[in-house]
Amino acid sequence: MSISRILLAATFAVTVGTAGILITPGTASASALAEGTYRFAFDGSKQTIDGVAKPTGSYSRSIAMRSACPPSGCVATGWDTSIGPTWLQPPEEGALVFRENRDQWVATRWKMFTCNGSIKQGTETLAFQVKPDGTFVGVSTQLEAPCPPIVIPFTATRVGDVSPDVQVADPNTV
């Protein structure tokens, strides 16, 4: 029963979060993202847990990104620099591989969360659209059973070039 409830809640959270992104006008057509370091600002004041508002503190992460648009579709690789400077193959927690589909970029990574007072492995899905000014607007959906899904909106802004000591995978090779 509780697994069914969690799956239903997760489906609802992803659907509602994604729907919010999909109804927001995006760019005219997909193109490679600008290479650089982005500040992802998560708005904790709008966080929901299991679909219920549960405000928390806001926070940010710096993610270094590279992208390419080969004939098979646009791909961006990212590395959460709060983990360290070296990009490691997924499923490393800091590694992100975004794929573009209909002007929406989506990546899922595994991540460690605190759930019911203990550390659990779960997943985080980041989904965003690129606005005309280059800003990303999207949601983070965190799933860690047996706890309910957590959805937090974010914006991301390019803050500079990728630091020379930060390694980000070639998006043409993932």
Predicted regions mapped to residue ranges:
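Predominantly extracellular/secreted and cell-surface proteins with exposed
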Residues: 56-124
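Internal, hydrophobic beta-strand segments that form the core of beta-sheet-rich folds
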Residues: 122-144, 153
